[in-house]
């Protein structure tokens, strides 16, 4: 696999090694051994995934920007197995030199790219195709009482969602998240969330 570091430390784009022939293709979508040997040294710590999730959404659906508060913080490894999405990670760690900055990557059924989002980031995506099936691995279980978010429509984040926001389809919960300027982050750059 090819590991691409982004402008924000710890946020990684992962391109799997694809084997194609007349029958189709094959690739390892996840190998704990390879993740530990190749990615953990870049991150400076191990990540152990314990839950896999899948969602199906239609064009214009926007989900996010979500996170889980301590002590139930989550890292995520995400990919799109059908269709096309724009996936985004926003740094919400107080004191971080990249606080409020984001990384956006297009994930498609054809490019097979995966996106690693560390703890201390808000995560969201929008669907660019007619439908999309989205899968993600988490290193902590879902805890609804720790659910949090910031507004996916916050213009100050500078995210180009590609689709016009008037076509956005959001859950009621996601329409109620605070803008970044009104948000009191539970994360701090000086607190190691992996200990």
Q: What is each model feature region?
A:
Residues 1-110, 131, 138-195:
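Non-catalytic, conserved peripheral segments adjacent to functional cores
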Residues 107-131:
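Conserved metal-binding segment of the jelly-roll/cupin
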